[in-house]
Amino acid sequence: MQTTTINQDTKWVLDPTHSEVYFKVKHLMISTVTGQFKKFTGSVETDGDDFSTAKIQFAANVDSISTNNEQRDAHLKNGDFFDADNHPRLIFDGDKLEKIDDEEYALYGTLTIRGTSKRVKLNVQFGGLTNDPWGNTRAGFSVSGKIDRDDYGVSFGAVTETGGLLLGNEVKVFAEVQFVKQEVLEEVA
């Protein structure tokens, strides 16, 4: 006798109009410059509403980087930094979301910048689930973490006259994101 079970896979699509992705890096080691990626996509696949089973895909368009300074943005896009012509996207593939408590998670995955992929751990705060006025279920998350830009070949290393670094190597990354639920039923024999 053959049995058929129905697994409910849920896809969540990132809502870019209610999300932002940004970073902070030390400048001259005395102040912080903030930048953001204005164009990005993302999705999450879960087993129902259980985010501990999440598989996450995210990509940011490097050409959309903005620090509110056109000259600096152009420099960030060139070969000294992100090399947008050869590496147009920054990619994150999350493969493990470890629940710490009801609101806190540790997210593990692979971050690819300039063609270099490294494992990273990010901190995630679950903001909750809610229904919007149009009948959609939404999930909100705050994501934060730190990476070393040298690990990804983003190693522009100008030094000041006094021997100090022009830019810090540690980059703090942040995302405030909303995902919209889209259910897909999959039949497994």
Where are these regions (language model features)?
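Low-complexity, acidic/polar, glycine-enriched regions of mature
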Residues: 1-189
